[in-house]
């Protein structure tokens, strides 16, 4: 099986965590694309979805799934999203799709975070995949210098403006042995909107598409 088939396996397995009448938080990315397709088969059972990006909103509506405003809820029962990398502690790098800020907000408001990945995303140490940081544009020079101080190589992601009107710095060669500390450090920098390091709010369940089937890891 190729990676897309493994992603699809994990995405469809997430339906086991969907219950009638609930509102589903929905992430962004290629694996989530398969989850939205799967979710459309039970759309008559759920109350709707909260979307983490404009691109996911388009896909949800295209599949006939009602999209709701997050601000009308105090919490969500479940959030389903993928990750660019995930370690053994279920901490993640996310934001390859530039939706990290909304993803963090929805994850924080959700009782259960189900992460759907293919087996290539599982790592021992985070950082092989570049770490995304959403920043306001005027802060690029300052934040880049601060990232260099902690050993990372910052690069502006070209031709990308986030749904919030900001830009993305991708940090290369930053191998993250202490994810919680790094998350706090970067979040404290003036001009940072959000960092794509999910170290404090980890996944509750990870569904991993493998050649042998779907592996389930619970926190």
UniProtKB/Swiss-Prot annotation:
Signal sequence segment: none
GO cellular component: cytosol
Catalytic activity, as annotated: aldehydo-D-ribose 5-phosphate = D-ribulose 5-phosphate
UniProt binding sites for substrate: 28-31, 81-84, 94-97, 121
One Pfam family of this chain: Rib_5-P_isom_A
The protein's annotated pathway: Carbohydrate degradation; pentose phosphate pathway; D-ribose 5-phosphate from D-ribulose 5-phosphate (non-oxidative stage): step 1/1
Stored InterPro entries: NagB/RpiA_transferase-like (IPR037171), Ribose5P_isomerase_typA_subgr (IPR020672), Ribose5P_isomerase_type_A (IPR004788)
Keywords assigned: Isomerase
A single GO BP: D-ribose metabolic process
Enzyme class: isomerase
Gene Ontology molecular function: any one: ribose-5-phosphate isomerase activity
List of catalytic residues: 103
Its EC number(s): 5.3.1.6
Quaternary organization: Homodimer.
PANTHER family named among the record's database cross-references: RIBOSE-5-PHOSPHATE ISOMERASE
Family as reported in the entry's similarity comment: Belongs to the ribose 5-phosphate isomerase family.
Described purpose of this protein according to its UniProt entry: Catalyzes the reversible conversion of ribose-5-phosphate to ribulose 5-phosphate.
Identification of the protein by name: Ribose-5-phosphate isomerase A
Protein source organism: Buchnera aphidicola subsp. Schizaphis graminum (strain Sg)
Gene for this chain: rpiA
